[in-house]
Amino acid sequence: MTGPTEESAVATVADWPEGLAAVLRGAADQARAAVVEFSGPEAVGDYLGVSYEDGNAATHRFIAHLPGYQGWQWAVVVASYSGADHATISEVVLVPGPTALLAPDWVPWEQRVRPGDLSPGDLLAPAKDDPRLVPGYTASGDAQVDETAAEIGLGRRWVMSAWGRAQSAQRWHDGDYGPGSAMARSTKRVCRDCGFFLPLAGSLGAMFGVCGNELSADGHVVDRQYGCGAHSDTTAPAGGSTPIYEPYDDGVLDIIEKPAES
């Protein structure tokens, strides 16, 4: 393990009074004693070096030997002033080193839930001001108007925003049932001209539909450019279902008895 070295740190304080730099630099033993007093001699390891915080303070570092804190370091801040003959201990803290095991960054609850986490009985409310949703509108009461308006969400409190629809379309296009998937690349046939393809209503219908083939992507939203081997125009291969082979006559085999072991 490496840390700030005395040689590299001294160069940053070349213009300081010589005595002050020497006092701060020479307080390594004093810093170690402070750690020992704080946590015991078995908790402090090798000296790692010194770094300078400002014109009157420096930090001495030591390897920490504490259960559960592998890779951590003791940092002891010492301070002094020009003309002083000793340094003063300001604080002793435990800090993570370059190889320290740290807890992951805290993530707010609403950002922790991932696709596939929702289980039966779970309640998952949309986030406040969710950009995927915009307010819907009350039905007019005119049956003919409302029937047409239902396609764009009238009568619902919330409908998907243009941004939300675009996000969904991008996920579907890039997903397992998009044109870039391994299944789609394995065939020249596409869903847009398949008899099992059920187009979506509204603007998303220009790109997507639902597969109605129980042997393929049944019930999934598929891109019009997606395809598979179960396309409605797929023809059965010519010929019988199993190859025909010449009969094998096992009567021509010579049977040789294995000699008894001596």
UniProtKB/Swiss-Prot annotation:
Pfam families linked to this entry: DUF3027 (PF11228)
Keyword Acetylation annotated: yes
Keywords, sorted A to Z: Acetylation
Sites bearing N-acetylthreonine, chain numbering: T2
Name of this chain's protein: Uncharacterized protein Rv0877
Source organism: Mycobacterium tuberculosis (strain ATCC 25618 / H37Rv)
